[in-house]
Amino acid sequence: MIKAIMAVDEKGGISKGKSMPGPKNNEDLKWFKKNTLNQVVVMGSGTWADPFMPTPLKSRKNILITSKNNSIYPGADQYLKGNNILQEIQNLENIYVSQDIFIIGGSAIINKSISIVQEFYLTRIYGNFNCDKFIDINKISNTMNLIEKIDCDETCHFEIWRK
């Protein structure tokens, strides 16, 4: 199944200055690990290069979308060139049949792929972190149903959306 997982602030912001905004949120990191461990993660080169993102992510198949030479981003298990990125992501379901495919960023890839995402794991971080990259929250709520809301703590809650 193709899924996406992302943390957003109250305005749908996901990054600032090419990195995760705001203070590190341990609850969100635990949620991310719990859901993506032993699965396939798909990300763009900006997410791969984020200094707060240890790459490759351990105990996961790491797939990198890049138009650049693979040697610039060593360590990925597979590279997608992005010629027809939605089809390439969908083809991963035929390769990794026993694992979920999690799209983990960045914003352009998330926004472009919402049409093929069957479940979206959304962490709502309370506050506005003056982000410069956003995902379209309305696109999620207009095309999916909220199936679960999980209260966490005073910093965030988790939502699972499904088509």
Where are the regions that the model predicts?
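Enzymes that bind and transform nitrogen-containing heteroaromatic metabolites
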Residues: M1-K163
